[in-house]
């Protein structure tokens, strides 16, 4: 027996030793790969290539294990870049003598989420316009452009259209799934309490169709956004007002021939012909059999090695990205966790080198408790240094709640904001339990609230009154926060609140925001208030991770390829996952939410 245990533990030790050696070797290989990766360079007469098939988020994207292994492949995949990355690359390329133009490629497929939003595309579009002012051309190659992609690409000097191209141009839409019938069929009870007649998040759980109030607000919202999109495209392509929408309505899908005849494109030409033409004009990259080029991510690597215009002072601006649903607790990389964000904002508030905070909001809201946590820290910071808000695709409900703690708010015309309203939602399984012979009984103190949140019992009228009172209290607090933050009378706020969403352009008109502008405008404004000059140092949260942090995440995460090409099955899967995530995010400890649904499709 002694011999057995000796052999057993000896073998076990050997296994652990081998695993340890393998792990050390693995980490060493990864580190060597990082060190030995080819240093990016820019050849003379190069074009900067912007691949819009890759999502462009506001915040640095969640780490993927594929990025760690990218260096093992001779042909590295392009890694996703952020909005600020793209803007920085375009702005530097305008004055870089080696960069002669920009080439836009890839099919931007509208999917659920927050990346590549219209406000982000608008800011990139404006940067491309300034790039053209340096007398450098912008080219675009179009295969199957959806409206957001074409909105961006229409700024190009030359739009090369593939002979097999189909332009899929449609306006924004919303087709929510309604679960009330299914929930009733399966015996699941839903009880709702809300403040704000336009507060539509709960509708799929209690209705079988869209309410008149929600239809009213969405029709107005979509009209504002669509008007901005069509007007911008018509001006860029030299088309008469109203002609773009007329073309779409009369033809549906627009093929390449019609696109060129209608001035949506410059000429029909295959990709190989475009490559040959650009090789002739700018020189050839023999290794890759294409024209001389540098991708945005590679160009950023060059810029990191050759920083320009960064002041020697340690003073800086903190850019905080509130991108995703606001949830209670720490949250994940895809969420805005109330505790985590409040803690980081507190650090920036207490850091004397941080002279201003820019909060980039791209969130539909969420937990009322978490929104208040973040609001308090922002308000405390605003007492000692400028806090400026830049609104992205969404800054609605809880996203707007945290915004009003700031000194100044920037939004884009196509930002979705407002939604000053609150709701609570309780699920009970009383009927399904009864149908299956499950009963419940209880012993409590004299406190009537002891069984308030029993999931087997339907809430009584008295219970509902208690919960409605809590929702009304938070709504009044929301209105008060807006009233004080925006210097509006409570009556004025109530008139434009009620859970109604507004476009950024309308929000500026009714004084929910101060100015029309993007992230760059907000940073410039904050820099001016903090006296940091034209090119302030920036620190970001969430920030980019170093190798040790990436290795930690590698052992916690499932590797997945970067999202570039999306097949129809994956697209449906993402839609279902998005619907489920909406429900899973309802984790407020008090069951009170300031949340706007994100079932809008940008087509």
Named regions from a protein language model:
Residues 39-41, 46-177, 308-432, 472:
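Cleft-lining beta-strand/loop regions that shape enzyme active-site pockets
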């Amino acid at each position: 027996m002694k011999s057995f245990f000796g052999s057993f533990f000896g073998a076990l030790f050997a296994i652990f030793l081998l695993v340890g050696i393998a792990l050390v070797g693995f980490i060493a290989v990864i580190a060597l790969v990082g060190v030995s990766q080819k240093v990016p360079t820019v050849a003379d007469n190069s074009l900067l290539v912007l691949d819009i098939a890759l999502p462009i988020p506001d915040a640095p994207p969640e780490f993927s294990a594929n990025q760690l292994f990218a260096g093992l492949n001779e042909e590295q995949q392009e890694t996703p870049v952020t909005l600020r990355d793209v803007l920085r690359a375009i702005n530097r390329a305008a004055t870089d003598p080696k960069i002669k133009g920009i080439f836009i490629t890839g099919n931007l497929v509208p999917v659920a989420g927050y990346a590549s939003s219209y406000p982000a595309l608008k800011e990139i579009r404006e940067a491309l316009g300034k790039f053209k002012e340096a007398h450098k051309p912008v080219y675009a190659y179009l295969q199957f452009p959806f409206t957001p992609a074409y909105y961006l690409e229409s700024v190009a000097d030359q739009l090369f259209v593939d002979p097999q191209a189909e332009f899929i141009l449609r306006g924004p839409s919303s087709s929510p799934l309604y679960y009330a019938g299914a929930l009733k069929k399966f015996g699941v009870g839903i009880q709702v309490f809300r403040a704000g007649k336009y507060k539509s998040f709960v509708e799929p759980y209690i209705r079988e169709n869209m309410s008149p109030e929600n239809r009213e607000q969405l029709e107005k919202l979509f009209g504002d956004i669509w008007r901005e999109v069509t007007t911008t495209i018509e001006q860029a392509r030299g088309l008469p007002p109203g002609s773009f929408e007329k073309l779409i309505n009369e033809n549906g899908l627009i093929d390449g021939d019609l696109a060129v005849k209608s001035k949506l494109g410059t000429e029909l030409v295959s990709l190989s012909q475009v490559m040959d033409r650009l090789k002739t004009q700018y020189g050839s990259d023999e290794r890759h059999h294409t024209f001389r080029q540098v991708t945005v991510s590679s160009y950023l690597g060059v810029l990191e090695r050759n920083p320009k215009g960064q002041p020697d002072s340690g003073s800086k601006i903190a850019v905080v990205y509130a991108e995703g649903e606001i949830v209670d607790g720490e949250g994940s990389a895809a969420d805005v966790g109330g505790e985590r964000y409040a803690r980081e904002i507190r650090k920036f508030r207490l850091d004397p080198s941080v002279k201003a905070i820019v909060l980039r909001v791209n969130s539909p809201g969420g937990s009322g408790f978490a929104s208040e946590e973040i609001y308090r820290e922002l308000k405390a910071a605003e007492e000692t240094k400028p806090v400026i808000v830049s609104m992205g695709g969404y800054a609605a409900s809880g996203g707007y709640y945290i915004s009003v703690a700031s000194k100044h708010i920037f939004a884009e015309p196509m930002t979705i904001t407002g939604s000053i309203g609150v709701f609570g939602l309780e699920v009970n399984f009383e009927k399904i339990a009864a149908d299956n012979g499950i009963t419940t009984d209880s012993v409590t103190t004299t406190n009537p609230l002891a069984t308030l949140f029993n999931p087997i019992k339907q809430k009584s009228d008295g219970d509902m009154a208690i919960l409605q009172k809590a929702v009304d209290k938070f709504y009044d607090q929301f209105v008060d926060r807006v009233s004080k933050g925006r210097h509006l009378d409570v009556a004025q706020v109530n008139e434009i609140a009620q859970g109604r969403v507004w476009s950024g352009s309308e929000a500026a008109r009714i004084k929910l925001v101060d100015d029309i502008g993007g992230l760059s405008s907000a940073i410039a404004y904050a820099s001016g208030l903090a006296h940091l000059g034209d090119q302030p140092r920036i620190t970001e949260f969430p920030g980019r991770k170093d190798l040790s942090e990436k290795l930690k995440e590698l052992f916690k995460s499932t590797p997945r390829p970067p999202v570039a090409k999306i097949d129809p099955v994956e697209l449906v899967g993402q839609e279902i996952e998005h619907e489920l995530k909406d429900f899973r995010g309802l984790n407020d400890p008090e069951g009170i939410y300031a949340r706007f649904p994100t079932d809008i499709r940008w087509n």
